[in-house]
């Protein structure tokens, strides 16, 4: 099992979602779309639809950094052949978030706010509140707040409700500056205003791997973790962990330590 997440470092974590954008916001909003998430666990193949993805999370505890959760990341099954692990009984790729994130994010999914397949006409004339109201029947006599509370069984003290309020999505004042935008594009706009890295913010990459194997007929497990903290909003952990391996490979090619050509994966010596 392999888990990875681009998160916000504890010292820069100052919102209820425990999250800020440390890479492409659009990819975060659309995460999980484009097909069922698939993996195999104890020789059983499992498939999870996008609609159910954020309801099916796994709890993780990372030493010194606390509680996290993970959801299945796209199709893990194809990596069996890539890594020559065709007979493996468990292979799972997961995306890490802080505990509680997915439960709140699931509201956006269920309402249809992450849909990028159609455009909302005259979206540039809408307020945030009108955007949220768009996903409920126009003849509803209840307020948009009441509709959401009823649909998702929330009350004023619920942390999920507090997370929604923090985003100011019920505002009549805040306007959407996007013309004929998709629901996902509008949601991205709202979230970027709330979750962008501020000056001197530090991001955090968390990687957690579980390796199970049998030796001398005895089952063993090895856990491997890596946590990388960025320097600031520019020199991020995301930039380092993505960019440095590529730079190392480029130098190895120039120094002829890597002699293969073309697009190659790091799966062989």
Question: Which ranges hold each PLM region?
Answer:
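C-terminal catalytic/substrate-binding lobe primarily of soluble NAD(P)-dependent oxidoreductases
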Residues: 2-269
């Amino acid at each position: 099992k392999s888990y990875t997440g681009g998160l916000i470092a504890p010292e820069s974590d100052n919102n209820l979602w425990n999250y800020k954008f440390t890479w492409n916001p659009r990819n975060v909003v659309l995460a999980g779309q484009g097909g069922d998430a698939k993996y195999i666990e104890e020789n059983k193949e499992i498939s999870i639809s996008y609609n159910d993805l954020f309801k099916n999370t796994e709890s993780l505890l990372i030493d010194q950094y606390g509680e996290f959760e993970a959801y299945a990341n796209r199709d893990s099954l194809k990596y069996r052949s890539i890594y020559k692990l065709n007979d493996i009984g468990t292979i799972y790729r997961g995306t890490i978030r802080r505990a509680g994130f997915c439960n709140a994010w699931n509201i956006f999914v269920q309402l249809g706010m992450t849909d990028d397949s159609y455009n909302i006409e005259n979206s540039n004339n809408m307020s945030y509140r009108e955007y949220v109201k768009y996903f409920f029947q126009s003849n509803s006599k209840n307020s948009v707040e009441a509709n959401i509370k009823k649909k998702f069984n929330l009350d004023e003290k619920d942390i999920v409700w507090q997370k929604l309020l923090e985003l100011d999505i019920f505002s009549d004042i805040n306007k959407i500056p996007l013309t004929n935008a998709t629901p996902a594009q509008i949601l991205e706009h709202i979230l970027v205003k709330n979750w962008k890295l501020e000056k001197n913010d530090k991001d955090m990459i968390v990687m957690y791997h579980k390796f199970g194997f049998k030796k001398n007929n005895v089952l063993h497990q090895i856990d491997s973790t890596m946590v990388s903290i960025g320097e600031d909003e520019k020199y991020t952990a995301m930039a380092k962990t993505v960019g440095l391996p590529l730079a190392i490979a480029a130098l190895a090619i120039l120094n002829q330590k890597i002699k293969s050509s073309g697009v190659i994966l790091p799966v062989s010596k």
